[in-house]
């Protein structure tokens, strides 16, 4: 590995991608941007290429590639433009890359994230859907390739920091009783249940504590985000669903906790800023400045905790059930949720319909065994088709 680490940022124009580039720019002596990818914000992607001068940039189609390549040449930049999933996999597994930030949202991030894992890279995992969809296959690839997998979700990063280094021996073996996964409760934590039928995409995207993209903001409002994180935590830390308890913590200061059999509870605290887990994972096992302000406990004053209400947040229940069933159920849950959230953002369904659509899809057929990646994508395809049927009837 060279002194300056070469970083590929998949999903560079999103919230996580931009935060990653902010941290990288603070440490030019340690990190350089090897490749960037973007999907729809091509003007922003061009600006990032000018700022960071990557070797490669990946865009979704030939038309976007032609336009961007022309702009980059006009700016006298040597950056080469690649296209589509093949391009994403190429920059994720490239021989000169040391570390990959996997921050593409949704199922689209699975193949390039797996490409990074199979190439044995240090993978900073922000794409939770990769593990939700293909958990057993994904973790098997990590073990076989020798890749280093570091979680970026603030909750999983917190759990990682609170566990001993040898937690791979098993949670019981290292004395863990349970993992406490914190959740803010989102913008609808106290909204009267009857009003949830009428909330708008703008209200759902107005998170009280975190700055996030639209899809993850809606997932946070429905608490599907926490459900997906529960499934992800099961795979990352080899935990059973019943070992993970979700706790509403409205201040988003404690990012998660680990409860040990001797009565000790370790927690990781910090301001709600994704640059903290990003900097932790980039530098691990060392520490670097992230640009995040120090935590002011006196300004916070108090920390509150409550149990989640599954009547208010049925998506959390559906995710836990999918985790318990296993097989293709988590992939179908994720696909149905992606369709439902997109329909809600387009104002085609109500917020409360998100859980209804997902439950319909999960009840429409029994979960199947998932022994190869093709089975994962088939489950994803079936779930999207079923979700489309539900949409057509409502």
UniProtKB/Swiss-Prot annotation:
Binding locations of NADPH: 13-16, 127, 129, 213
InterPro entries, A to Z: DXP_reductoisomerase (IPR003821), DXP_reductoisomerase_C (IPR013644), DXP_reductoisomerase_N (IPR013512), DXPR_C (IPR026877), DXPR_C_sf (IPR036169), NAD(P)-bd_dom_sf (IPR036291)
Catalytically driven reaction(s): 2-C-methyl-D-erythritol 4-phosphate + NADP(+) = 1-deoxy-D-xylulose 5-phosphate + NADPH + H(+)
Amino acids binding 1-deoxy-D-xylulose 5-phosphate: 128, 154-155, 184, 207, 220, 225-226, 229
Lineage top rank: taxon: Bacteria
EC numbers, comma separated: 1.1.1.267
Pfam families: DXP_redisom_C, DXP_reductoisom, DXPR_C
Gene3D superfamilies: 1.10.1740.10, NAD(P)-binding Rossmann-like Domain
Reported cofactor(s): Mg(2+); Mn(2+)
BP GO annotations: isopentenyl diphosphate biosynthetic process, methylerythritol 4-phosphate pathway involved in terpenoid biosynthetic process
Residues holding Mn(2+): 153, 155, 229
Membership in a protein family: Belongs to the DXR family.
Function as written in the Swiss-Prot or TrEMBL entry: Catalyzes the NADPH-dependent rearrangement and reduction of 1-deoxy-D-xylulose-5-phosphate (DXP) to 2-C-methyl-D-erythritol 4-phosphate (MEP).
Annotated PANTHER family: 1-DEOXY-D-XYLULOSE 5-PHOSPHATE REDUCTOISOMERASE (PTHR30525), 1-DEOXY-D-XYLULOSE 5-PHOSPHATE REDUCTOISOMERASE, CHLOROPLASTIC (PTHR30525:SF0)
NCBIfam families for the chain: Dxr, PRK05447.1-1, PRK12464.1
Annotated HAMAP family: DXP_reductoisom
Entry protein name: 1-deoxy-D-xylulose 5-phosphate reductoisomerase
Organism this protein belongs to: Ectopseudomonas mendocina (strain ymp)
Gene transcribed to yield this protein: dxr
